[in-house]
Each structure stands twice: as structure tokens, then as C-alpha cells.
């Protein structure tokens, strides 16, 4: 299950990435490249990581009119990334357009990237969602609604918190992909995320993938931290 552990490369530039990856010589990781790193380094960072043998979740959370998202996804698919995402709030037409773009842009002989949708960010509390975003549903209801819409639009799954996974399994079935950020070791600070869980708890709740950032990237020994997270995620007793 180690390939379903995604390491968030939340760094400002390639130099920091190179320094971090020195801890992982010989390891083939599944890494997340977000806005900060991609906007700084561009497609070259994807090429660099692919040459190192890593799988890539390109986390740009696209949210625009359908035609723009379709064109953008066509370009992203040509980079040979393994996973991409959109905001479910963009609606069904936009999500369907995203899939069309990925199919058109995928490299010959390869499957299109996994495409998932963001339901609600893990920094969003129910109070914030109601007072600031203007959604009157409960957080669980809003996430379930977006997940159902995502599945109906032909996407593979959603980004959600671990707490929402059991409900989404009921609504969308066991094959629906759930990618869960907000993963922390029990000894770590929560920082700016509200809905968090440990790797062990994520496994128990049924997450398909977990995304782990600071617990690994800010650790004194990143490789040892990675192994600890991996063991908890895979249910290994040491």
C-alpha cells in the first residue's frame, strides 16, 4: 500500500525539493506538487521528478469555466502526471470537461491521470462553511452532495477528510477513490488544518490514499518519519 501514501512536496523551489529527496535515494515515492512549487518551477519540476522515478499528484485544484478547464487538463495530461484535481464547486459541466481534456491530452499508450475533486478543504470548519461560504447544509451533507455530483460527472473520486470517508463509501461505493490530506502523527501539531487524523485512523476509516506533508518534510529525519507513517498506514506492528 506504500504507493497510496502521498508525500506533499510543499516547498518554494526545486533546490528545497532536491535537498529533501536526498533522504530518499533509491525510493520511488508518490509525491504531491502543489501551487507554490509548480507556479515557481513550471513543468520542469514534473520532468525532474518523473526522471527520478516518482509518481505525481499535481494539486492545482482547477476551478474555471468548462472550456478553460478542458484545455488546461489537456496540457496537464501531456506532462504524464498520475493524478490531478478540480474543485467540485465548479459543477458537473466543468468536471466532465476536465475528463475530456485528460483523455485528449494523455500520452499515447497510457491511461489518463486519476481525476479527483475537492469537496471542502480540510481547513474548513462547519461554522466557516455556513457563515463565510453561505452553504446551509451540514459539513457532512455538503461533502456527500459534492461527492455524489463528482461520481455522476465521471471523475474517479474526491479529496476529503478521513472523517467523511465512511459516509462517502455509503453514498458512492467502495471503488470510489478517497484522497485524504490532514494526516498527522499523534505527536505532531495540527497547524492550520481542522479535520485531521493519524495514518492508523485513516486506514481504519477506509481512505484510498493519504497525503502527508509536514510530519515527513519537517521531520529531523524525513526517511525515518516516512517509514513510521508508512508502517502505521499499512498496519505494520514494529
Curated annotation (Swiss-Prot):
Gene: pyrF
Annotated binding of substrate, by residue: 10, 32, 59-68, 122, 184, 193, 213-214
E.C. no: 4.1.1.23
Molecular function as annotated in GO: orotidine-5'-phosphate decarboxylase activity
Associated pathway: Pyrimidine metabolism; UMP biosynthesis via de novo pathway; UMP from orotate: step 2/2
Annotated keywords: Decarboxylase, Lyase, Pyrimidine biosynthesis
Active site: 61 (proton donor)
Catalysis: reaction(s): orotidine 5'-phosphate + H(+) = UMP + CO2
Any one Gene Ontology cellular component term annotated for this protein: cytosol
SMART domains xrefs: OMPdecase
Protein name, as recorded: Orotidine 5'-phosphate decarboxylase
Species name: Bacillus cereus (strain AH820)
One GO-annotated biological process of the protein: 'de novo' UMP biosynthetic process
Family (UniProt): Belongs to the OMP decarboxylase family. Type 1 subfamily.
SUPFAM superfamilies associated with the record: Ribulose-phoshate binding barrel
Function: Catalyzes the decarboxylation of orotidine 5'-monophosphate (OMP) to uridine 5'-monophosphate (UMP).
Assembly mode: Homodimer.
Keyword flag Transit peptide: no
Organism superkingdom: Bacteria
